[in-house]
């Protein structure tokens, strides 16, 4: 609120959005930070640190979210397991990767959970060969079928909407998972770690897909005493099952309202 609320000057910042995309942008704001979603773009974070100090950057999510774990015999074989860049990863087949298409150019920037750690795709040579940055030690550099591909990517689409609820940042509605909600860890908005394979804690991230008779993409979310989720086919409420019961990975209730 500078200059008595009079707009004596306009501050401009470059964005990745096209004019035709503006009406599909959704956002959630907490103080001087705003998270912005559009299905064609990575989640952006607009931060203000001063009247003329604003930054817009891709959100660098911690460990997730991910699609379901691989259930095929396809393995990934990394050239190293320790944290670092420029690591080659070879897939034994394309089965189980992008519906059998193997790695795609649109997978660059995508996270992959592998064994005990995770990595980010930095380059793609062909359908079975990629280069990655290992962000968390993988535990072993031997081939394994224990992997899961990231949910947010140019291949699968990015979230359609976003809101804050019960100290979590909530995203919803990617192209490939139009009825799915993605809750961050409690109090850690950019951490999407579900603690797969470990002991689940109440504050862990949550992925939940609304079950319905037909696919109805999530269009909006509104946080009240419950989380109201609007889809193309009706509205749902999301809660922990009671007025004062918090949502946890093992305690989440979704009810259709209309």
Model-derived features: positions:
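Short, surface-exposed charged micro-motifs
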Residues: 24-26, 45, 120, 161, ...
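Short, surface-exposed terminal/edge motifs of secreted or surface/virion proteins that either
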Residues: 39-58, 130, 178-184, 235
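N-terminal assembly/attachment segments of tailed bacteriophage virion structural proteins
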Residues: 1-35, 100, 107, 195, ...
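Beta-propeller and closely related beta-pinwheel folds
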Residues: 17, 148-168, 173-258
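Generic structural motif
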Residues: 23-27, 56, 251-255
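Autoprocessing Asn-cyclization modules and mimics
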Residues: 8-12, 48, 53-147
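Non-transmembrane elongated oligomeric "stalk/shaft" segments that connect baseplates/barrels to distal
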Residues: 1-5, 36, 41-43, 51-53, ...
């Amino acid at each position: 609120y500078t200059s008595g609320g009079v707009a004596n000057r306009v501050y401009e910042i470059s964005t990745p959005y096209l004019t035709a995309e503006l009406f599909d942008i959704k956002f959630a704001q907490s103080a001087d930070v705003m998270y912005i979603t559009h299905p064609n773009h990575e989640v952006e974070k607009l931060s203000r640190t001063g009247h003329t100090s604003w930054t817009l950057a891709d959100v660098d999510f911690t460990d997730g979210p991910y699609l379901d774990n691989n259930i095929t015999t396809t393995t990934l074989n990394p050239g190293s397991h320790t944290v670092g860049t420029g690591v080659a990863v070879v897939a034994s087949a394309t089965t189980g990767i992008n519906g059998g298409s193997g790695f795609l150019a649109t997978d660059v920037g995508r996270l992959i959970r592998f064994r005990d750690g995770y990595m980010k795709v930095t380059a793609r040579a062909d359908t079975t060969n990629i280069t990655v940055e290992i962000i968390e030690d993988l535990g072993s550099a031997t081939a394994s079928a224990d992997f899961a591909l990231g949910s947010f990517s140019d291949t699968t689409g990015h979230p359609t909407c976003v809101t804050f609820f019960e100290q979590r940042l909530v995203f919803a509605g990617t192209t490939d998972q139009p009825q799915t909600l993605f809750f961050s860890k409690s109090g850690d908005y950019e951490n999407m770690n579900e603690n797969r394979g470990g002991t689940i804690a109440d504050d862990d991230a949550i992925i939940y897909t609304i079950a319905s008779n037909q696919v109805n993409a999530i269009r909006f979310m509104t946080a009240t005493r419950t989380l109201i989720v609007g889809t193309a086919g009706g509205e749902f409420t999301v809660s922990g099952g009671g007025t004062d019961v918090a949502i946890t990975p093992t305690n989440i209730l979704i009810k259709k309202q209309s």
